[in-house]
């Protein structure tokens, strides 16, 4: 067997990346996206796109994504191969690291061919040193889903002071069901987790003025609702309720408010997500008319 060559793409080598045979059952390909199309739109950089070749033939590929101003990749979201060992070696050899987010069709475990493709990628990522963290639901709202009526229980106010919002994150993160948040708290503490959330919202290329704090009729803070825009889609950027007001379904009110704000902007879609283990939030998305468009497995 000839030696494996692992390297980043050169400019103009998109066709080489796409020469790998792939049935398109998982990942972006399962949803009609192509690497060349996304790269042309500025989603990927050649030096963050790697291939493993044997005798000049691509046997594994990986592409890391980030926003246009980011200095480091934020996600590994193309990872395909015909040789699992080469794929694991590619991830170990590349100097790049980010969470691997494997996109899957809803109910993927019930489709044998899809389940096989998904498990192969998980196994290769684990062989490279990654570990499964959480499975998530990904939602896609469109105007045909309808805009749910506002419950009218809360008052929503803008909050321009980042320090005030950071303090809200400190409160919301206490007892959070979000697996990523819980992991960050365990690793680096509550303050770091709160700052990470604020940094993410500041990173989004959507107006800061959209952020809303929610208050009950007694004037008590209930939570935070943030509609936003990613580099690709309008999205629900954040929904969170402070511990003392949990158990009353207020996350639904926050979700509805964010949906109304984006709908009023005339968007034709809203994407959102939650951990599959966050049963209350998943129920709120269902009640608000958000259909599950994808499932996703995150490995770190």
Enumerate the predicted regions with their spans.
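A short, well-structured alpha-helix characteristic of acyl/acetyltransferase catalytic modules
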Residues: 1-3, 7-25, 133, 138, ...
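Conserved donor-binding loop and adjoining core beta-sheet/short helix segment
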Residues: 21-24, 33-108, 217, 223-234, ...
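Hydrophobic adenine-recognition pocket in adenosine-nucleotide-binding enzymes
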Residues: 239-241, 274
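Short acidic/polar active-site loop segments enriched in Thr and Asp
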Residues: 96-98, 268, 291
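Acyl-donor-binding surface of acyltransferase catalytic domains
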Residues: 82-160, 299-300
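Flexible, substrate/cofactor-facing loop regions flanked by secondary structure
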Residues: 30, 34, 149-234
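A structural microfeature
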Residues: 60, 134-135, 222-223, 294
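Conserved acetyl-CoA-binding loop-helix of GNAT-fold acetyltransferases
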Residues: 84-97, 241, 247-264, 279-287
